[in-house]
Each structure stands twice: as structure tokens, then as C-alpha cells.
UniProtKB/Swiss-Prot annotation:
UniProt entry keywords in alphabetical sequence: Lyase
The species this protein was found in: Bordetella parapertussis (strain 12822 / ATCC BAA-587 / NCTC 13253)
UniProt xrefs under Gene3D superfamilies: Jelly Rolls
Enzyme superclass (EC): lyase
Protein name according to UniProt: L-ectoine synthase
Gene: ectC
Keyword Lyase appears in the UniProt entry: yes
InterPro entries: Ectoine_synth (IPR010462), RmlC-like_jellyroll (IPR014710), RmlC_Cupin_sf (IPR011051)
The keyword Aminoacyl-tRNA synthetase is annotated on this UniProt entry: no
Gene Ontology MF terms: ectoine synthase activity
Length: 131
């Protein structure tokens, strides 16, 4: 059994920070669950281009506000507590922070190793862990 507190990830290499978000990666590929599990905060007033070509992601919004805009059709969806969205078709999108920090719980398949950051195209590369 794996039991962790997200507080134990803070300040470690499993807490990844960019200009627009901070992600605490609680379960990773090395844990052998077949998915990774993260608590992420999107900073207010930010806009992040994302296009997960190699991963599927489900996101549960638990606090704050923001929006997601799909690039293919320009649709915008408001995000807030209780909203779930799934990028089941590797949907390219803009993730926008609102007036308050947007706190979300994310599940990725295949699982992340922990150190991924978006490249210039908004993609997480498939990363193999060192043996």
C-alpha cells in the first residue's frame, strides 16, 4: 500500500513549478499504478498552451476558477469546484487561470515520471526513468 501526504512532496523534486502553475506529483510511474496523480495549482491571470500528444489526462477542479479553451473549435468552458474535464482525444487547448488560484487534481496515462514540463508545443515528452 502507498500512503502519502501532498505536503511531503512540497519542496522536493516532485514539486514542479513554472511561471503559470505548480504541480505536486504525488503518484508517479515508479509507483507502478499505471497512472500518475497530481495536485496542480494554476496561477490567476495566466494562460498556458497545452497539447498532450503522448498522454491522456482527466482533471477534477476542486477550488478556484479559470477556463479551458479548445484550439480546434475555439469553445471555452468555465472551470470551478466540481467540474471535471477529460482530454480523451489529446485535445490541444489553452488553460487559463481566473481571478483565484485554480486547484485541480490530475490523473495521467501513461504515468509521468515526475520531471516533465511542457515543451514549446505544449507537449510532455515520453520520458523513461533511469534504470
Amino acid at each position: 500500500m502507498i500512503v502519502r501526504n501532498v505536503k511531503d512532496v512540497m519542496g522536493t523534486e516532485d514539486e514542479v513549478r513554472t511561471d503559470t502553475w505548480v504541480s505536486r506529483r504525488v503518484l508517479l510511474k515508479k509507483d507502478g499504478m499505471g497512472f500518475s496523480f497530481h495536485e496542480t495549482t494554476i496561477f490567476p491571470g495566466t494562460r498556458t498552451h497545452i497539447h498532450y500528444k503522448n498522454h491522456l489526462e482527466a482533471v477534477w477542479c476542486i477550488e478556484g476558477d479559470g477556463s479551458i479553451e479548445t484550439i480546434a473549435d475555439g469553445k471555452t468552458y468555465e472551470l470551478g469546484p466540481g467540474v471535471v474535464y477529460a482530454l480523451n482525444e489529446n485535445d490541444e487547448h489553452w488553460l487559463c487561470g481566473g481571478k483565484q488560484p485554480l486547484r485541480v487534481i490530475c490523473v495521467f496515462n501513461p504515468p509521468l515520471t515526475g520531471q516533465e514540463v511542457h515543451d514549446a508545443e505544449g507537449v510532455y515528452a515520453l520520458v523513461e526513468e533511469a534504470a
